């Protein structure tokens, strides 16, 4: 096999040494090796978190997902791979291969870019700690087309054996905040599975208005929650991010983490409200108690707690 530099091609040549003549050559010109590694390829793989060329097909998209898996120690399923875990959720979820999308790769790719940007917000080794003692399971992401439920859903977190599954709608415009919301649900599930009282219910309830009880119903929460307690309701005394936060304690906490982690323009302002700040402190302490945090430093969700109260 010879490399023809003039034609930039490989040629298969059969030689009979008995019919060849040999002469010595004093000077030679070094030909570029066809085995030379193009280091620009690694830049395309490991460069910016967004803005890389669109994968040409599902195989290239799978390769991108594989790189994210290795980078963050998570599991990512695509297209029809999501069907099994989605069935385990006992909810009606349409996977992207069943959605009749004009270009399935183009629909999923931005959702993987958003996932890359989101996972980069968490400390190194964070997601590894979701695995069991044998190193099995962990966090599994399922980019899907849509959910068919009794109320509007754009993402959900559920457990499937040793997996903390996070299904999320690829067409949503606020994927980073959505993912931060669902990652908190998975985090809370991990904490409570190891310590049922990881977040003390009495301590949490003490943060809320006197006599308040969560609605535990989507329609009631969205229709009846008073704006006088809501951050997105022009309240003076803020207890909750928005009406959805009043549905139950889990959604209250996930909504806080959604905006603290995924909405940088709101995080500091939200954490300046004493009750929200106290709730965030409770959540941060639970994570510190339930994870090996050696080498973490100040996490993104703890950063707003370091900002001095501007009202002081």
List PLM regions with ranges.
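Residue-identity detector for threonine
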Residues: 5, 21-23, 28-29, 36, ...
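Hydrophobic, Leu/Ile/Phe/Ala-enriched alpha-helical segments that form helix-helix packing faces
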Residues: 68, 115-130, 183, 187, ...
């Amino acid at each position: 096999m010879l490399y023809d530099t003039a034609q930039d091609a490989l040629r298969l040549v059969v030689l009979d040494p008995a019919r060849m003549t040999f002469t010595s050559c004093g000077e030679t010109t070094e030909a570029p090796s066809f085995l030379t590694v193009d280091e620009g390829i690694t830049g395309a793989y490991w460069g910016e978190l967004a803005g890389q060329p669109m994968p040409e097909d599902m195989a290239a998209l799978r390769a991108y997902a594989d790189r994210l898996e290795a980078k963050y120690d998570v599991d990512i399923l695509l297209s029809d791979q999501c069907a099994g875990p989605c069935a385990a959720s006992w909810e009606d979820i349409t996977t992207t291969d069943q959605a009749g999308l004009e270009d399935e790769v183009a629909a999923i790719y931005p959702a993987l870019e958003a996932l890359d940007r989101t996972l980069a917000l968490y400390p190194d080794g964070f997601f590894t700690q979701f695995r069991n003692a044998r190193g099995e399971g962990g966090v599994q992401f399922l980019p899907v087309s849509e959910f068919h439920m009794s109320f509007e859903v754009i993402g959900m977190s559920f457990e499937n054996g040793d997996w903390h599954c996070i299904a999320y709608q690829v067409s949503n415009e606020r994927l980073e905040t959505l993912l931060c919301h669902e990652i908190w649900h998975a985090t809370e599930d991990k904490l409570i599975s190891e310590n049922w009282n990881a977040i003390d219910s009495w301590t949490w309830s003490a943060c809320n208005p006197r006599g308040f009880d969560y609605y535990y119903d989507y329609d009631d929460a969205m229709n009846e929650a008073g704006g006088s307690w809501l951050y997105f309701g022009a309240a003076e005394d803020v207890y909750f991010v928005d009406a959805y936060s009043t549905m139950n304690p889990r959604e209250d906490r996930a909504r806080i983490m959604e905006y603290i982690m995924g909405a940088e323009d709101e995080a500091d302002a939200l954490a300046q409200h004493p009750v929200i700040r106290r709730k965030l402190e409770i959540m941060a302490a639970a994570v510190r108690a339930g994870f090996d945090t050696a080498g973490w430093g100040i996490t993104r969700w703890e950063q707003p707690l370091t900002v001095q109260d501007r009202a002081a």
